[in-house]
């Protein structure tokens, strides 16, 4: 990132600990606020990611930073026979487990508590790894991506959905107003944790999006790296493949 952004500026805790605390605090309101703040467009972005995933032969899939499980549930529309949803926040994960059970996917989806930078899986375990709005919360971005690379099978795919910043007028100017001023104020009216959405907005701005993130993926070892901007560049879907050697 351009600079280290943490949820609680005055805290001496690690970013990882702060992120866990933040998501535990907002877990009960996360889905509702996410729909309002994104104007529901995040649903369309996830559908696009799933369409990309469906082009691959997938037996085992891992959804990192699964949160309340939206993307893990959506992955049932791929060929995956085994889906693991992993999150560092017990509060978010508890809601995700409820969602999985309510939809009857408990035999397909396993929800586990875990750290994306220290994955408890063997090398070359998953055909597909997905991360939606999670990589910018990694304490060490390259370490987390290297762990993902390790657990993906050769020829396996990484798909990352993350916020980005539009570069063209007038979308860049509107995004600056929306993310920097309007979104935090909307969240403060509705959220118990006022600083959480300040952090989410600021971390989006400072995330190395576009070609900068492509370069990091290539550095880690991924090939056929590409990014696909969504909705005028407000978000991007990144893809990369693990080579056979």
Kindly give the residue locations of the regions a language model identified.
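Class I SAM-dependent methyltransferase SAM/SAH-binding core
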Residues: 60-118
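N-terminal auxiliary segments of SAM/dcSAM-dependent transferases
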Residues: 1-20
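Hydrophobic beta-strand segment of the Class I
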Residues: 30, 129-130
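A short acidic, Gly/Pro-enriched loop at the edge of an enzyme's catalytic core
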Residues: 117-128
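Conserved alpha-helix/loop element of class I SAM-dependent methyltransferases that forms part
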Residues: 29-32, 38-59, 74
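C-terminal alpha-helical "lid/dimerization" subdomain adjacent to the S-adenosyl-L-methionine
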Residues: 17-18, 88, 161-216, 220, ...
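Core SAM-dependent methyltransferase catalytic element
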Residues: 220-245
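A short glycine-rich, Lys/Arg-flanked "PGG" loop and its adjoining helix->strand segment in the class I
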Residues: 142-157
